């Protein structure tokens, strides 16, 4: 296992990890995120060409999401006390902890621990009370754990609070693409039985049985599902939250060359397929097609408020495990 640290501007750290087997990553202290990830010398996530673009992109490429991943209604109650979030422009919700103001856009502290079996990069940050309208303080730890003898890494989430009650729901926003122009020929499989019902602005209000065009309990090719969605769904893409039918949650994404298996103890999974051609410069390709990447974001189901409320004396914990295999 090898690693090196580069210092970018404003004390932002780039941490390069190589397990000397096939997996390489560049982590960034700003947003506690994954800037680059490669398997057998091929990129497996979308990486912006310039670090500066990564830092402040509104698409959250590879960053930690929080303090609340997903859309949380801007006004409501937490343990009987009112809260008032700063919403997205023209909306009645805050997304991923607040656009350009959340932990995704802050520089985290970090430390590195190495043993004979693994390398841990541990990021930490403490939020301020009422930051973005979110009540209370949260101490958050995000650990990227790389194994020396396997093409596998895990993300461990941990959080505590000195406040009476806070919201907490953490995830990661890597966009997967296994060095191809798009993901149309990829197969997706996952053990889910319900999907969120949303308002037109995608704020979750209920859940229902997974409809046929979103059923991935058996491996299904993404292009077939996306063709249907583009014709019949106003979103023109997959931007949905699924509830796992059993624990752990299991997701498999594969094409002809690479298989990615994800397991998690999170109760739900948000999937977002980037089906746009916004003018962004990427590192691996400059001619990506539509359907250029898929974000797989395990998280707690935001409609179940008890899952995302953390009290003083409690410890928030979740994990996501990523395993890569050549086909």
Listing of model-derived features with the role each one plays in the protein:
Residues 1-327:
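An exposed, glycine/acidic-rich loop-and-rim segment of catalytic or binding clefts
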């Amino acid at each position: 296992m090898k690693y090196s640290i580069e210092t970018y501007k404003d004390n932002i750290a780039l941490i390069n990890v190589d397990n000397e087997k096939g997996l390489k990553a560049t982590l960034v202290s700003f947003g506690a995120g994954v800037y680059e990830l490669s398997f057998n010398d091929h990129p497996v996530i979308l990486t912006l060409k310039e670090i500066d673009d990564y830092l402040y992109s509104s698409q959250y490429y590879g960053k930690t999401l929080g303090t609340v991943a997903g859309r949380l209604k801007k006004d409501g109650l937490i343990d009987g006390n009112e809260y008032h979030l700063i919403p997205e422009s023209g909306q009645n919700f805050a997304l991923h902890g607040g656009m350009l103001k959340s932990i995704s856009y802050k520089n985290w502290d970090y430390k590195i621990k190495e043993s004979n079996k693994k390398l841990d990069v541990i990021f930490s940050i403490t939020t301020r009370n009422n930051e973005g309208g979110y009540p209370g303080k949260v101490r958050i730890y995000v650990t990227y754990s790389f194994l020396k003898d396997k093409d596998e890494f895990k993300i461990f989430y941990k959080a505590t609070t000195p406040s009476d009650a806070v919201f907490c729901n953490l995830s990661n926003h890597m966009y997967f693409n296994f060095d191809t122009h798009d993901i149309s020929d990829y197969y997706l499989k996952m053990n889910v039985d319900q999907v969120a019902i949303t308002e037109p602005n995608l704020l979750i209000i209920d859940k229902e049985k997974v409809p046929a065009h979103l059923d991935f309990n058996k491996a299904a090719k993404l292009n077939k599902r996306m063709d249907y969605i583009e014709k019949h769904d106003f979103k023109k893409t997959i931007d949905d939250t699924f509830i796992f039918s059993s624990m752990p949650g299991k997701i498999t994404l594969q094409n002809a060359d690479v298989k990615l298996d994800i397991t998690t103890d999170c109760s739900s999974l948000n999937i977002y397929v980037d089906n746009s051609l916004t003018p962004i410069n990427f590192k691996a390709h400059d001619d990506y097609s539509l359907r250029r990447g898929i974000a797989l974001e395990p998280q707690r189901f935001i409609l179940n408020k008890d899952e995302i409320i953390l009290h003083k004396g409690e410890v928030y914990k979740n994990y996501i495990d990523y395993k890569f295999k050549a086909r």
